[in-house]
Amino acid sequence: SPVVRVSEGRVFAGRAWIEASYLGEPVALTGEDARFARGPGLDATAWHVIRGGIDGLVVVPVVDSDDPARAWVISSRTPDRLAAAIRRAQASR
């Protein structure tokens, strides 16, 4: 399973990482909103770390204009906690 963590001002998801300062406001999704974001609403230009069987999802826009990914879409059993950890990392920079 891909590892997702927030540490030292960075967000790690699977094999990739990004400085939290390059990310916008994270949005935690569950239920129908998460299903839509994983399905018909999925942004093909985003970096995806999506695991089947996990309802929660965090979508974070990338604010670095040089980054080809427009957002990060990350599965999480605790999307509120992941979004809060990203916000804390952004505030510490």
Task: Map each language-model feature to its residues.
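Non-transmembrane, membrane-adjacent beta-strand/coil modules in membrane-associated proteins
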Residues: F12-V73
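Transmembrane-cytosolic junction motif
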Residues: S1-R10
